[in-house]
From Swiss-Prot:
Biased composition (Polar residues): 317-331
Renumbered residue ranges of the record's region DNA-binding domain: 20-125
GO CC terms of this entry: centrosome; chromatin; cytoplasm; kinetochore; mitotic spindle pole; nuclear stress granule; nucleoplasm; nucleus
Organism of origin: Gallus gallus
Region span, Hydrophobic repeat HR-A/B: 135-208
Sequence segments annotated as region (Disordered): 275-333, 464-491
Highest taxon in the source lineage: Eukaryota
Record motif 9aaTAD, residues: 374-382
SUPFAM superfamilies documented for this protein: Winged helix' DNA-binding domain (SSF46785)
Entries under Gene3D superfamilies matching the protein: Winged helix-like DNA-binding domain superfamily/Winged helix DNA-binding domain
Protein name (database record): Heat shock factor protein 1
Length: 491
């Protein structure tokens, strides 16, 4: 069985078969063998060969020349060397041909031309060209991918930087929040302490009350204020005993000063505040008339000073005291004890003032003396500024009043003790607001914001050498006669 195959291989290698493959040599021998013509043989033209009955050919012929009996492997090897199957027209129909005939042909596989077998080469796939094309495509793709990767990398780096910045900002914000929480806690503690302090003040004020500071004379504030609290007794006391006349005044209760029907918010009111009692020069005028009087505010006479606003705006009052004197005693230094009075005491005091005014009117009408009241009202009017006051116009009237009072005291020296309540009169002007005299314990007399009239207790309000010494109204305040004034203006 192996004789024909080996012989064919030797034959193929003999005539130059060194360049011809063993498959081609075996195929040439197989086709040339006359014993295999019923299964494989040349075509009539000699350009191709036919294979009949592929099954029988695979079983009987292929094992003799090849190591297999698979027809499919034989056909695949033919295709590898460039043999192509020839298809006839009758074989392309739907009807299966009666005869199993397969024809293969190759340009260099021709009958009688064995030397052409050298030209038959086994097909080699062009891997290099395919690889080159693939490499080009891959390089383009790789370049594009690299570009895209670089872009994505740049974006990623920017996002990373933004995330890092946001992280730092977040940490800073958290630190700030922590510090703010600590500050808020501290501030809350401070606020709580302040609230507790204010609550304690309010509670203590409800129990003890707060004394209100009251501005006195020469205050131009016209705003109305509430009544001060806590009633005290009101008294006028003499400090020095150089005057032969001791001005005695009973301690008035709060009901005697103001009454409900008194016009505290309307025009000026002239009322009697003190009563002058004639006493011997040896009498001691420095004694206190009321042992229960509140602490004393000393009033002294000083030169006029620039007006200073009080710490709190409260009703302004103007007071003028007219004293009765026939001689020229030494100026009396008066101490003013002030208290905040209740409603009943104010009413009683106002009743006393009304009665004193009636007595004064009766006294003036009895002696046929007339006083220019309009000038006095203008003098003490709250709407009139101190620079508009013309005190020399009132010289005659005030001097006449002083002479009249002096003459009455000389005519009735024996009735001084019996009628002590009707002899001496002191004029006090009440404006639209009620008169409140301030306690020295509640008001800082030495403060720069209080009016000058609080300091009258230390000396004369009008100093020596000043042009105000010639004002007769000053004699009423000091208890001494003064010459005619030149032309002063009150500041």
């Amino acid at each position: 069985m192996e004789g024909p195959g080996a012989a064919a291989a030797a034959v193929g290698a003999g005539p130059g078969g060194s360049n011809v493959s063993a498959f081609l040599t075996k195929l040439w021998t197989l086709v040339e063998d006359p014993e295999t013509d019923p299964l494989i043989c040349w075509s009539p033209s000699g350009n191709s060969f036919h294979v009949f009955d592929q099954g029988q050919f695979a079983k009987e012929v292929l094992p003799k020349y090849f190591k297999h009996n698979n027809m499919a492997s034989f056909v695949r090897q033919l295709n590898m060397y460039g043999f192509r199957k020839v298809v006839h027209i009758e074989q392309g129909g739907l009807v299966k041909p009666e005869k199993d005939d397969t024809e293969f042909q190759h340009p260099y596989f021709i009958r009688g031309q064995e030397h052409l077998l050298e030209n038959i080469k086994r097909k080699v796939t062009s891997v290099s060209s395919i690889k080159n094309e693939d490499i080009k495509v891959r390089q383009d793709n790789v370049t594009k991918l690299l570009t895209d990767i670089q872009v994505m990398k740049g974006k990623q780096e920017s996002m990373d930087s933004k995330l890092i910045a946001m992280k730092h900002e977040n940490e800073a914000l958290w630190r700030e929040v922590a510090s703010l929480r600590q500050k808020h806690a501290q501030q809350q503690k401070v606020v709580n302490k302040l609230i507790q302090f204010l609550i304690s003040l309010v509670q203590s004020n409800r129990i003890l009350g707060v004394k209100r500071k009251i501005p006195l004379m020469l205050n131009d504030s016209s705003s109305a204020h509430s009544m001060p609290k806590y009633s005290r007794q009101y008294s006028l006391e003499h400090v020095h005993g150089s005057s032969p006349y001791a001005a005695s005044s009973p301690a008035y209760s709060g009901s005697n000063i103001y009454s409900p029907d008194s016009s505290t918010n309307s025009g000026p009111i002239i009322s009697d505040v003190t009563e002058l009692a004639q006493s011997s020069p040896s009498a001691s005028p420095s004694g206190s008339l009321d042992e229960r009087s509140s602490p004393v505010v000393r009033i002294k006479e000083e030169p006029p000073s620039p007006s200073r606003s009080p710490k709190e705006n409260e009703p302004s009052t103007t007071t003028a005291a007219a004293g009765n004197s026939t001689e020229q005693p030494q100026p009396q230094e008066k101490c003013l004890s002030v208290a905040c009075l209740d409603k009943n005491e104010l009413n009683d005091h106002l009743d006393t003032i009304d009665s004193n005014l009636d007595n004064l009117q009766t006294m003036l009408s009895t002696h046929g003396f007339s006083v220019d009241t309009t000038a006095l009202l203008d003098l003490f009017s709250p709407s009139m500024t101190v620079t508009d006051m013309n005190l020399p116009d009132l010289d005659s009237s005030l001097a006449s009043i002083q002479d009249l009072l002096s003459s009455q005291e000389q005519q009735k020296p024996s009735e001084a003790d019996a009628a002590a309540a009707d002899t001496g009169k002191q004029l006090v002007h009440y404006t639209a607001q009620p008169l409140f005299l301030v306690d020295s314990s509640a008001v800082d007399v030495g403060s720069g914001d209080l009016p000058i009239f609080f300091e009258l207790g230390e000396g004369s309000y009008f100093t020596d050498g000043d042009e105000y010494n010639e004002d007769p109204t000053i004699s009423l305040l000091s208890g001494t006669e003064q010459p005619k004034p030149k032309d002063p203006t009150v500041s």
